[in-house]
Amino acid sequence: MIAPTFRPATSSDVAALHRLVESAYRGDSAKAGWTHEADLLGGQRTDEAELLDILADASRVILLAEVDGVLTGCVQVADQGEGLAYLGLLTVDPTRQAGGLGRLLIAAAEAEARSRFPATRMEMTVIRQRSELIAWYERRGYALTGETRPFPLDDERFGLPQTRDLEFVVMEKALG
C-alpha cells in the first residue's frame, strides 16, 4: 500500500467526502468492502449539511486520507471534554478495505486527539450487531465498556433501520 497523507477536511471537500462515506456504509457499493451496514440500514449515512456542521465546530475535526491526491478514507475526532475524545465516521473506500488504511486512520485520529484536545482516552460507538467490526476494534486496543446507547431509529438522517433492535455499544481505549 502506498502511504497515505492525512489532512483536515475543509468545506471544499464536503461533496467528495459525502460520496466516500455513502459508498462505504450504504447500498450495493458498500458491499464491496467488509465493514458496511447495508444489511442493517438503508437510506443515508450522513448528508452534506451534517458534514459542514462538523467542519464548522472547533471541537471536531474530520481527517482525510489521500493516496496520490485521491480521497481514500476519513475519520472524525471530537472533543468530549475531561480528556475524552470520540472517534467516528471511520471510512475507507470499499475497494481499498483490508489493506491497512483503517489502522492508519485510527492511529492518525488518536494522535490528533492527543495533540489537538489533549485527550487521554478515546471512545467510539459501534452498532451491537456488528460483531466482526467490534472484534477488529478490540484488536486495535479498544474494549467494550458495558455501556449501550440507543440508535436513533426514527431519525432518517442516520438511515432507515432494517430491524428495530439496533443499539450502540461503547468502546474505549486509553491513549498513550
Can you describe what each PLM-predicted range is?
Residues 1-15, 19, 169-176:
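Conserved N-terminal entry element of GNAT/NAT acetyltransferase domains
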Residues 22-51:
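Conserved GNAT-fold acetyl-CoA-binding loop/helix
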Residues 46-63, 164-167:
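A short helix-loop-beta-strand connector motif used in the catalytic cores of GNAT acetyltransferases and
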Residues 64, 70-78, 86-91:
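Conserved beta-strand in the GNAT
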Residues 79-90, 97, 116-120:
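A conserved beta-turn-beta hairpin within the catalytic core of GNAT-like acetyltransferases
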Residues 92, 98-111, 139:
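Conserved acetyl-CoA-binding loop-helix of GNAT-fold acetyltransferases
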Residues 104-121, 143:
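Conserved acyl-CoA
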Residues 120-135, 139-176:
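C-terminal "cap" of GNAT-fold acetyltransferases
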